[in-house]
Structure formats: structure tokens, C-alpha cells
From Swiss-Prot:
The modification Phosphothreonine is found at residue 2. The record marks 344-345 as: Cleavage. GO terms for molecular function: chlorophyll binding; electron transporter, transferring electrons within the cyclic electron transport pathway of photosynthesis activity; iron ion binding; oxidoreductase activity, acting on diphenols and related substances as donors, oxygen as acceptor; oxygen evolving activity. It comes from the Eukaryota. GO terms for cellular component: chloroplast thylakoid membrane; photosystem II. [CaMn4O5] cluster binds at residues 170, 189, 332-333, 342, 344. A quinone binds at residues 215, 264-265. This is Photosystem II protein D1. HAMAP family: PSII_PsbA_D1. Belongs to the reaction center PufL/M/PsbA/D family. It holds the Pfam family Photo_RC. Keywords: Acetylation, Calcium, Chlorophyll, Chloroplast, Chromophore, Electron transport, Herbicide resistance, Iron, Magnesium, Manganese, Membrane, Metal-binding, Oxidoreductase, Phosphoprotein, Photosynthesis, Photosystem II, Plastid, Thylakoid, Transmembrane, Transmembrane helix, Transport.
Amino acid sequence: MTAILERRESASLWARFCEWVTSTENRLYIGWFGVLMIPTLLTATSVFIIAFIAAPPVDIDGIREPVSGSLLYGNNIISGAIIPTSNAIGLHFYPIWEAASLDEWLYNGGPYQLIVCHFFLGICSYMGREWELSFRLGMRPWIAVAYSAPVAAATAVFIIYPIGQGSFSDGMPLGISGTFNFMIVFQAEHNILMHPFHMLGVAGVFGGSLFSAMHGSLVTSSLIRETTENESANEGYKFGQEEETYNIVAAHGYFGRLIFQYASFNNSRSLHFFLAAWPVVGIWFTALGISTMAFNLNGFNFNQSVVDSQGRVINTWADIINRANLGMEVMHERNAHNFPLDLAVVEAPAVNG
């Protein structure tokens, strides 16, 4: 009898836990994805803060030349970063227990891999949690779909690119100047500015900013007057009101006359779908471009493609970019190799005798 009661209490406790996890009445929705999201993001955030403040220098290139990234080792907020895991580790899974000591783990950049792996699980769980909450509320799933764009971008630079290049040391450092360094080196090695998927990403980000500003300014400029001159226009809206707060016909007429008629949406639903889809698709393409360049399917190469009748090269902007790429590549990992990879792979001329 006691065993039966204990089983009932246990089942009841589990049932109450399940109900609490999936309840939409909580101030913050947890969800089953949240059960994974909370510990992984807390771990990633905690280790990031500790490592950013106090991590010792990391031998990023695997040549016994440690690079300092933390505040206590001479950096500031702008120059500081979590240094990627050492090239000596490559793509090996490198948890703390795989190192001979904690000092060795820190020297080889173990915190970077720990942070990236937990962060990846956390943001994927956050995306799943968005879908889960939408499902429970009877909403459509497009919020999670939109969030998949930054998830894809983060996955590309932190996971796919290191896999393609053969080492986590090629991943993006977790810091401001480290991010810029990653961008410069990426351009030098892959000519990303000449990759069409990057161009689509630029169009998505800047186009999304433009469309967001246009939409916000049009709506703000065509609000239906509900207040006096002495009140804020924002007081004219009450949360949950049924009537429209702005005149879409006026906004449509203005923009149609400013550009041309068919440049303006006359359907609010299709307009907002467009505002969501444009940057999302652009960032998807950028993430796809990073993932292909990870395996050295690089941007277009138009170097020395224009010549005169005598066969002499007429430089174009492609040649200027190529010269800049070589200069940046020379300065990258300058103690790990003596020449840019583009020059190092050229065969030496044959010597007779």
C-alpha cells in the first residue's frame, strides 16, 4: 500500500512539473526546449564573463606564442576577446577532463570551445522554445523561422567554418576587435566581398534597415489624430484597441506618389511578410556563403582579367582588392608561415644542372 501511494505521489510530482514547464500562464514561458536552453546559456554566459576577465593567454596558432585576450592580462573592452582553441587541438573535442591539468586546458583555449558548444545548444533551444510557445498559443511558426537566420549565421562562423578549415583556432574570436580581425582575415583568404551570397546578405541587412525605417516613418507620419497638440501622439493608442491606429490608405497614397504606384503595398499582411522575409533570406544566404567558403569555395577571382592588345595587364578594382588581400594575408599569423598561402603553393622554378 505504501509503495502504491509513493508511486502516485511521484507521478503527481512529475505531472505537476510537466504542467509547470508547459504552462503559458507563467511570467516567462519555460517549455521543454527551455529546460535545455537555461543551463546551456547560463554556462556559456558565466564562462564567457570569467574568461573575458581573467583567462590566461592562449597558444592560438599552436606554435608556443600565446595571445592575451582577457582584461587582467592587459586588454580593454575593445581589444579583449575569448581566444579560440589552439591549432594544436584542431577539431578534437576538448573538455576539461581531456587536459592533463586546468593550466593546460586554459593554455590551449579550452574555454572557447566550451562557450561555443554551449552557446550553440542554447540558441538552438531558444529557437525551439519560440516554436513551442507559438504552438501552445495557436500562433503560426514564423517567429522561430525568422530567428533561424541569426542562428544560421552563428553556426556558420563558430561551427561550420572551423570544421571546413580543420581547426577551432580558425573560429571567430569572442570579442570586438577579434570579430574585426576575423572579418579581415576572412576577406584575405576567401575574397568574401566578391562572393554573390555575401552581396545578397549585404542587400538583406541594409535593405532591411531601409525598409524598417521607411515603414516606421510612414506609419508615424500617418497616425490617426486622437490627441491634442499638448499631448504626446503616443497617448492616442490604447493597448488592445480594435480600430486602426494609422491610415494605411494615406501611407499607400503617399509612397505610391513618391516612387510609383506599385512600389507601395496595399495589403498590410503582405507588407509585414516582406519586411520579415527580406533580411532573413539575405542572412540565410550569407550563412550559406560562409559555409561554402569554409571549404574554400571562395568569391569570384577577376584578377588580371583585362589586358591590352600587347598582352599587358590593365588593372581593375579586382586587382586592387587582390593586392589588399595579399597584404592582409601576409600580416596574418606572420610567425606561423612566411608567405601568404596564395604564394606558398606556387611551385618553385626548375633549376637545371
